[in-house]
Amino acid sequence: MSRKVRAPRGTDLHCKGWQQEGPMRMLMNNLDPEVAEKPEELIVYGGSGKAARNWEAFDAIVKSLQELEDDETLLVQSGKPVGVFKTHSQAPRVLIANSLLVPSWADWDQFRELEKQGLTMYGQMTAGSWIYIGTQGILQGTYETFGAAADKHYNGDLSGKFVLTAGLGGMGGAQPLAVTMNNGVVLCVEVDRERIERRIDYQYLDKMAENLDEALELVDEAVSEKKPLSIGLLGNAASIYPELVKRGRIPDMVTDQTSAHDILNGYVPADLDFPYALELRHQDPEKYMKLSKSSIAKHVEAMLEFQKQGAIVFDYGNNIRQQAYIEGITKAFDFPGFVPAYIRPQFCEGKGPFRWVALSGDPEDIYRTDRLILEEFSDNEHLCRWIKMAGEQVSFQGLPSRICWLGYGERARFGKLINDLVAKGEIKAPIVIGRDHLDCGSVASPNRETEGMKDGSDAIADWPILNALINTAAGAHWVSVHHGGGVGIGYSLHAGIVVMADGSKDAEERLERVLTSDPGTGIIRHVDAGYELAKKTASEQGVNIPMWS
């Protein structure tokens, strides 16, 4: 019988204080059946991204947090608690390192062998750092991406446009709602029926189609009426994409969010019955990976053909181009990644995916923060529109939460305002504030966040380490450094932070420091790379950068 984990609700503590209760509840929330993709295996999202190495380690982490003092710090090594040290009251309560390998050993083969020996785990980004909030966690970023694409190519609106994509897992599941929020029509190919049904249950997806003909009828009707609609097609992208090319059905926009970063535990090859594919993963992994590579090559060839015939095509951060390139598709990088194509200007302003979670479990606490945004940021029409749409259309998974993109200065201001509401009792329990590792200054990923940097610094990995170090010094409640998130082992290093608003003076000081230094590293990283918008932001915000003026 599989274990079911759910974070406690309310104000009763199970630890010695909220500084310990917060990470404990968020670890548990990552494994809530409403949140995690495979909670019985400790897998949260992203193929095999886990919250803890095994159930024994999970129990030991919980016990350690329950016993942790206010001047101690717990160390977690790839999902396993390995030490508790006396530090001080304003230090982080938890420091996490996940999936890190010495560079020459940093590939999937080495990683899987070490994982098999029980020595490591794959933490993805927010799985092993205990700040995953379900599909909403990537929703605004996806909304912003499709919105930026609409601005660039279609005068700011996807009305009457046919968007093709694939993958409805924890990350890809945000795509259908993000497209319809931008008024488009989207066909999402997904091989797993349960994932399609899950997205419908949580109102991220409108309809399911059993075959391509049925799906295209729905697409054509919605496009002709310029009516937003999302359709989940049960099928394999490596079969459906080439079939659409063969039929001459060229979408307006094409991307993909299958788990191509992991050709064993993520991607599913074409022409295999889904249950059999899952068996083959374990029975003959080498054969499975060979089939995955072949399917990815066909998948990307079809995307290139769509581009050749006039579609807007972009990589959505799953490293599918790299996998295809390795398999001999030499033009795989002819279509761009989403960050250089659409998102980098926001990074230059210190903007990124800012999220917060109500530890009380009461949705009213999140609704109060929604009103706070509308009250205090009323001059930001784009942000207010997002908050209103999220309030109307986003279903909570696990502990109630919200996400929006805020920039340098805005994050610290909002953090203080939330802390004030907790202090006044207008919010019932502390609010946890964190972000995705996909942020302006916290990641080095040459095929994704740092692709095509102006100065050629795509692979420079000092920046996420500096981000983690300054946020530790600034007093984030927990800080994490990971390897391989999003694009797979060997292709990225990245850092995460979480800081809590518990209404105290201590929290106010931490929030001011952390929510300034964290986006600040994004500004300095982009100034250093020569981006004029980042220089303008640094000048306006008074960011201290020694060798630049």
Swiss-Prot record:
Compartments (UniProt record):
Cytoplasm
The UniProt catalytic activity note for this protein reads: 4-imidazolone-5-propanoate = trans-urocanate + H2O
Reading the lineage from the top rank, the first entry is: Bacteria
Q: Which cofactor does the UniProt annotation name?
A: NAD(+)
Arranged from A to Z, the UniProt key words for this protein are:
Cytoplasm, Histidine metabolism, Lyase, NAD
What family is this protein classified in? Belongs to the urocanase family.
Q: What does this protein do?
A: Catalyzes the conversion of urocanate to 4-imidazolone-5-propionate.
Name used for this protein in its record = Urocanate hydratase
Provenance organism: Natranaerobius thermophilus (strain ATCC BAA-1301 / DSM 18059 / JW/NM-WN-LF)
